[in-house]
UniProtKB/Swiss-Prot annotation:
GO terms for cellular component: cytosol. The gene is mnmG. This is tRNA uridine 5-carboxymethylaminomethyl modification enzyme MnmG. InterPro entries: FAD/NAD-bd_sf (IPR036188), GIDA_C_N (IPR049312), MnmG (IPR004416), MnmG-rel (IPR002218), MnmG-rel_CS (IPR020595), MnmG_C (IPR026904), MnmG_C_subdom (IPR047001), MnmG_C_subdom_sf (IPR044920). Belongs to the MnmG family. GO terms for biological process: tRNA methylation; tRNA wobble uridine modification.
Length: 624
């Protein structure tokens, strides 16, 4: 009988990262998925990254994950979003060739050390004494294991809706999983339903692009992965169009036929990626909504119209498409649809992503209530690492709000749960200036090296980068001009007779890297990414210093423990509402208590005073 230490169920974005991470740690791992050609399948939009999401991809790459490297083998349209704003909100994004992405993922995983792939369906999980023992396949056979990672995406009791038509499926032409839903219910997990959707696919040969707006990508694609030197995939353009008043009229006239508005779907959809029906209803005063026409591949004429996800009947979709500029003669290749599926309240998992009820069972991805490839992949890599570390009896790998967006996401989910699909935003991260795309490896790769999840090749690249950063920083401290000379060449500085280094100049408002290169031509020889990193560090030095002080306070509060048996109703001077919230959330640390919505600074002070009085030996204060 085959036996593996870790078994991953599901080959989507969470599953492939979980399986690869476990395998990198030297643990025999099995990935079970339904179809061989669908590893890392892009079920919805053909793109990776975006605002906040791009930072997640960089963090996954920093831990030697797959997503960043694979998109660099398949990216056909790179664009840095929000680049005119501050660096904390820059969002690297790349349009993907679907076929190239799946091909690259398949080639990597089928040749991955310590990883085997089984094409089949898991119907049940064998559990004894609240601990996983084996997976049970649909033919009745069992595969024993120590740890199981569930990354089931939208397949748990998945149900597709197109108008009044219902199709049991986890994705188009792929059957849903009911056995695992029943397993989770039997064990006693809190299960609810969520909904997501996708737009119709359009034949690009039937689009009149002269009526649309060209959206070029960046002139020089910036790779996601530290392992990629140059993106050599051909680059193409995207296009933008918009809905019209006629589009809106058709949607309003047919709202009763939409699965979302007919009452057919009761599950909650993503707030920040609404269907076109939702947009028309919720933003009724808007006369138009933008639609991004995104090619699905270099040799594929299919177009993904980002912005018009819908569950209207197919005939209504055909009608509304023809009211959009450039799409008057467009042909729909596949109708859009909504899909609802089961998920588990993420407060049922710990920050390692292991479930609290069942030892050795981990959840990652949409099963935890998230939406998005990047969010799923971020959870997958953490679940894979922790499952493997547990097999090896090593301490868990914990990411926090202070060092990563992945940590922010896991913290949000495990403390507060979610009643709608959770999507990552920069606004969720209070330390976002410190958690940028350009420094993801500086934040996380050393942590990955320490636990053994980072390859030798990436370790060498990282160490070389760190060396070059310090070398460049020292150079920027030595290159200097007198203030009088700087004034003569047009730099606005006070003529105090001192010398100004490049790092000093970087701190001047509106002073750019391009200006620095003109003054000091030697800077042209420096790696542009390293120069930009040091520019950002210098430009925002005072803000980063303040943020580091906040991070230090956060880390201090994270180790200030709150006893499990605390009675908040015995704490004087806090309101009944706050007592009820604290009793409901049961925070384990002062830091977590502070993050609960509605908990005031005064209440936190009252808790600390109460604990110091009750535990005057200070035993509650630290984990040590």
């Amino acid at each position: 009988m085959l036996k593996y230490d870790v078994i991953v169920i599901g080959g989507g974005h969470a599953g492939v990262e979980a399986a690869a991470a476990s395998a990198r740690l030297g643990v025999p791992t099995l990935l079970i998925t339904l179809k061989p050609g669908n590893l890392g399948e892009m079920s919805c939009n053909p793109a990776i990254g975006g605002i906040a999401k791009g930072i997640l991809v960089k963090e996954i790459d920093a831990l030697d994950g797959l997503m960043g490297y694979v998109i660099d083998q398949a990216g056909i349209h790179y664009k840095m979003l929000n680049e005119t704003r501050g660096p904390a909100v820059w969002g690297p994004r790349a349009q993907a060739d679907r076929k190239l992405y799946k091909k690259a993922m398949y080639q990597i995983l089928t040749n991955y050390p310590n990883l085997n792939i089984l094409y089949g369906k898991v119907e049940d999980i064998e559990i004894k004494s609240s601990k996983v023992k084996a997976v049970v396949l649909n033919d009745g056979s069992k595969i024993p294991c120590q740890k199981i990672i569930l990354t089931t995406g939208s397949f748990l009791s998945g149900l597709i809706h197109i108008g009044s038509t219902k199709i049991p499926a986890g994705r188009v032409d792929e059957e849903a999983s009911y056995g695992l839903s029943n397993t989770l219910k039997r064990v006693g997990f809190k299960i609810a339903r969520l909904k997501t959707g996708t737009p119709p696919r359009i034949d690009g040969l039937t689009i009149d692009y002269s009526k649309t707006v060209l959206q070029p990508g960046d002139k020089t694609p910036r790779p996601f992965s530290a392992l990629t030197n140059i993106v050599d995939v051909p680059q193409i353009n995207c296009f933008i169009t918009k809905t019209t008043s006629e589009t809106h009229d058709i949607i309003r006239e047919n709202l009763d036929k939409s699965a979302m508005y007919s009452g057919q779907i009761e599950a909650i959809g993503p707030r920040y990626c609404p269907s076109i029906e939702d947009k028309i209803v919720r933003f009724s005063t808007k006369s138009e909504h933008r639609i991004f026409l995104e090619p699905e591949g270099l040799d594929d004429y299919t177009i993904y119209p980002n912005g018009i996800s819908t569950s209207l009947p197919e005939e209504v979709q055909c009608k509304l498409i023809k009211t959009i500029p450039g799409l008057e003669k467009a042909t729909i290749l596949r109708p859009g649809y909504a899909i609802e599926y089961d998920y588990v309240d993420p407060r049922e998992i710990s920050i390692t992503l292991e479930t609290k009820k069942i030892m050795g069972l981990y959840f990652a991805g949409q099963i935890n209530g998230t939406t998005g490839y990047e969010e799923a992949a971020g959870q997958g890599i953490v679940a894979g690492i922790n499952a493997a570390l547990a097999v090896k009896n090593q301490p868990p790998f914990i990411l926090t709000r202070a060092n990563s967006y992945i940590g922010v996401m896991i913290d949000d989910l495990t403390i507060f749960g979610t009643k709608e699909p959770y999507r990552m935003f920069t606004s969720r991260a209070e330390y976002r200036l410190s958690l940028r795309a350009d420094n993801a490896d500086l934040r996380l790769t050393e942590l990955g090296i320490n636990i053994g999840v980072v390859s030798k090749k990436r370790k060498e690249i990282f160490k070389k980068k760190c060396y070059n950063i310090e070398k460049t920083r020292n150079l920027l401290k030595t290159l200097s001009f007198t203030t009088s000379k700087l004034v003569k060449i047009g730099v606005q500085v006070a003529q105090d007779g001192t010398y100004k280094t490049v790092l000093d100049l970087f701190k001047i408002p509106n002073f750019t890297i391009e200006q620095a290169i003109k003054i000091f031509p030697k800077l042209q020889e420096i790696n542009s990414n390293i120069l930009q990193l040091l520019y950002i560090e210098a430009k925002y030095a005072s803000y980063l210093a303040k943020q580091q002080a906040d991070i230090n306070l956060f880390q201090n509060e994270e180790i200030q423990l709150i006893p499990k048996n605390i009675d908040y109703f015995k704490i004087p001077s806090i309101s009944l509402e706050i007592r009820e919230k604290l009793s409901y959330y049961k925070p384990t640390t002062i830091g977590i208590a502070r993050r609960i919505p509605g908990i005031t600074p005064a209440a936190i002070t009252a808790i600390i005073i109460y604990l110091k009085t009750k535990y005057n030996d200070g035993s509650f204060i630290s984990n040590n």
